[in-house]
């Protein structure tokens, strides 16, 4: 009888954090660093029951995906984000349109910031918009195309921000053995290695 063993990794996955051909992972890492270095955003998430260092917010209150555990008896404030590559601009195969989507989910019992009287999700939205709108944080200018308030069930007041940016469309390729990247010329006969 053969014994099953868990496969061993064949590479260092942290390479994807900086490779030019892994936009989804690379951009989410840039967003993570920006959010965790912004003490005002972390303050407004109001995780006061926890004594956290900035990096401890990641995976608990700052999430690189949009899933909130509604089965949890305690509701907290969350800042979720995702990337999406939705289309290629007309007449150009060299670029793709990236959407960076933020979901700011604030516990309805904690919506109003006591010192300012402004809803927390609006304040966090303003801080994110200040830093990303018309910036070149990802190499090309990002612009805000949606800013929408809503609710999810009875627990959260939310605000969704969608930023759009044109990025190079997979024109680089990295050899994972040598970590060398090169630009592709869209030649179907080109040898990759």
Regions found by a protein language model. Give the residues of each.
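Acidic-leaning, charged glycine-interspersed low-complexity segments
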Residues: 118-176
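A short, hydrophobic secondary-structure junction motif
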Residues: 65-70, 106-108, 129-134
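Short acidic alpha-helical/loop segments enriched in Asp/Glu that coordinate divalent cations
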Residues: 47, 94-96, 115-118
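Active-site-adjacent structural patch at catalytic or cofactor/ligand-binding sites
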Residues: 79-111
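Protruding loop/beta-arch "assembly-hinge" segments enriched in small, turn-prone residues
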Residues: 171-193
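Short histidine-centered catalytic/ligand-binding loop motif
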Residues: 107-121
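Small/polar-rich, solvent-exposed N-terminal microdomains that initiate assembly or binding
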Residues: 1-92, 185-193
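Solvent-exposed loop and beta-edge segments used for protein-protein assembly and interaction
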Residues: 73-75, 92-96, 153-159
């Amino acid at each position: 009888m053969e014994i099953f063993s868990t496969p061993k990794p064949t590479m260092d996955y942290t390479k994807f954090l900086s490779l030019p051909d892994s936009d989804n992972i690379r951009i989410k890492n840039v967003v993570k660093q920006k959010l965790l270095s912004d003490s005002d955003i972390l303050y407004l998430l109001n995780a006061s029951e926890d004594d956290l260092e900035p990096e401890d917010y990641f995976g608990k209150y700052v999430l690189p995906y949009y899933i909130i555990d509604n089965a949890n008896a305690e509701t907290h404030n969350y800042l979720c984000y995702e990337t999406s590559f939705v289309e290629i601009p007309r007449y150009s195969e060299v670029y793709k349109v990236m959407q960076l989507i933020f979901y700011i989910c604030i516990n309805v019992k904690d919506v109003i910031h006591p010192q300012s009287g402004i809803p927390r999700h609006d304040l966090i939205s303003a801080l994110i918009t200040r830093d990303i709108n018309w910036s070149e944080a990802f190499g090309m200018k990002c612009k805000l195309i949606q800013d929408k308030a809503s609710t999810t069930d009875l627990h959260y007041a939310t605000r969704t921000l969608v930023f759009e940016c044109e990025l190079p469309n997979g024109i680089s390729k990295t050899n994972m053995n040598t970590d060398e990247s090169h630009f592709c010329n869209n030649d179907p006969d080109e040898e990759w290695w």
